[in-house]
């Protein structure tokens, strides 16, 4: 009752103020006074951090585009993009509160939750897997089953899940039937033929091989020199780059709004990279990657292939795709327990996609066709 009484007491004052403002408005405008638009308070910015899965490179071009194009700022977000590295586990960073958003593969999200980590996927950016295992065409290792008893390189720390699943599916126990070699984050072991097979992402390590010269011919290697075993063809192509947060953080309604705005801006960045790959290559170069322009151009192009076309709209994970990855995780020992509910939500990604559609943007890229990108020596 006290609040209502004060409201009525204040009403005459408000009316009087409006009358005074109405009488004096024209004179103030003529005198060059401040307009209502000019006195509008600037939008309050929210600080958030995005932890990348890996170092600065074309794999993350859409986020750099969102930053450089001002999409995050348009959504009232001051975003810090934090590069990853061999000693950085995105899940640990986010669970530790050093970042609100993290990027990693969906099988890693499942594994983290299986171990008690309270993270949830809120957007599945990559619609397909880019992981492969390479052998030399002249090695006679033409099928995944040929890797029994061979030196098989792969990155560890959770990056081995899909390969181990592929080996297991084909009757090869990774712990007993092959010599697993901890692969550095380059292709030197493979190029020097110190391993029989090596892991390679279509957008990164595969290009590193193609950017290298065959010492016998003096020419760059080509795909004809390689056997490429795609995890997607082998039935173990679990989904890769997705955006995750903690359950505790997303439970806050204010953070749910932040998440939707963050996804909207990020998706808009990826749409921009689909339509303007050269610009996005430059944004990555400006951010200071290790490898050169030619390599980043290849990477942006290959990443676009993993995102587009997207039947459900960028970032919105289909139930079928999730079920496939969850089944792979269960069948091949990536997780010990049934993942259950709560691994992912499409609520915020769907809201972001709907907002972008209202702006007239193409969120599915149904007609997308990747251009040809020339391989350059050394990725320069």
Where are each of the predicted segments found?
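Bacterial lipoprotein signal-peptidase II cleavage site
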Residues: 23-35
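Secondary-structure end/capping motifs
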Residues: 253-336
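Pocket-lining segment of extracytoplasmic ligand-binding domains
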Residues: 107-108, 185-188, 195-289
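Short, glycine-/small- and polar/acidic-enriched structural segments
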Residues: 41-184, 188-192, 196-203, 223-225, ...
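Bacterial N-terminal signal peptides that target proteins for export
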Residues: 1-10
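A bilobed periplasmic-binding-protein/Venus flytrap-type ligand-binding module shared by bacterial periplasmic
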Residues: 65, 131-141, 239-255, 310
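Conserved C-terminal helix/tail region of periplasmic/extracytoplasmic solute-binding proteins
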Residues: 323-380
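C-terminal motif of bacterial Sec signal peptides marking the signal peptidase cleavage site
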Residues: 18-22
């Amino acid at each position: 009752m006290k609040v209502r009484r004060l409201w009525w007491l204040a009403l005459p004052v408000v009316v009087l103020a409006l009358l005074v403002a109405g009488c004096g408005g024209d004179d103030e405008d003529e005198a060059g006074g401040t307009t209502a638009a000019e006195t509008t308070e600037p939008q309050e910015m929210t600080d958030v951090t995005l932890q990348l899965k890996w170092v600065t490179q074309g794999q993350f071009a859409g986020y750099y585009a969102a930053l450089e194009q001002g999409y995050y700022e348009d959504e009232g977000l001051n975003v810090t993009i934090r590069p990853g590295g061999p000693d950085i586990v995105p899940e640990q960073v986010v669970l530790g509160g050093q970042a609100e958003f993290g990027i990693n593969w969906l099988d890693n999200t499942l594994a983290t939750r299986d171990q008690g980590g309270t993270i949830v996927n809120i957007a599945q950016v990559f619609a397909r897997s880019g992981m492969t295992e390479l052998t030399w065409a002249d090695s006679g290792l033409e099928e995944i089953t040929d890797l029994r008893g061979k030196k098989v390189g792969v990155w560890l720390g959770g990056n081995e899940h899909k390969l181990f699943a592929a080996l297991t599916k084909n009757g090869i126990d990774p712990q007993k039937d092959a010599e697993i070699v901890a692969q550095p984050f380059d292709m030197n072991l493979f190029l020097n033929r110190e391993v029989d097979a090596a892991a390679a992402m279509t957008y990164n390590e595969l290009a590193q091989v193609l950017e290298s010269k065959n010492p016998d011919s003096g020419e760059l290697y080509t795909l004809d020199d390689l056997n490429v075993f795609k995890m997607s063809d082998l039935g173990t192509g679990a989904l890769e780059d997705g955006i995750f947060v903690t359950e505790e953080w997303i439970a806050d309604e204010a953070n749910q709004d932040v998440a939707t705005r963050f996804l909207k801006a990020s998706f808009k960045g990826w749409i921009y990279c689909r339509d303007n790959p050269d610009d996005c290559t430059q944004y990555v170069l400006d951010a200071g990657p290790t490898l050169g322009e030619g390599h980043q151009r290849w990477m942006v192009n290959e990443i676009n292939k993993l995102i587009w076309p997207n039947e459900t709209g960028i970032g919105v994970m289909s139930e079928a795709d999730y079920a496939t990855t969850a089944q792979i995780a269960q069948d091949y020992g990536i997780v010990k327990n049934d993942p259950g509910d709560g691994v992912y939500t499409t609520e915020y990604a769907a809201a972001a996609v709907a907002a972008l559609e209202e702006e007239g943007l193409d969120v599915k890229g149904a007609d997308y066709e990747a251009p040809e990108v020339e391989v350059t020596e050394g990725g320069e």
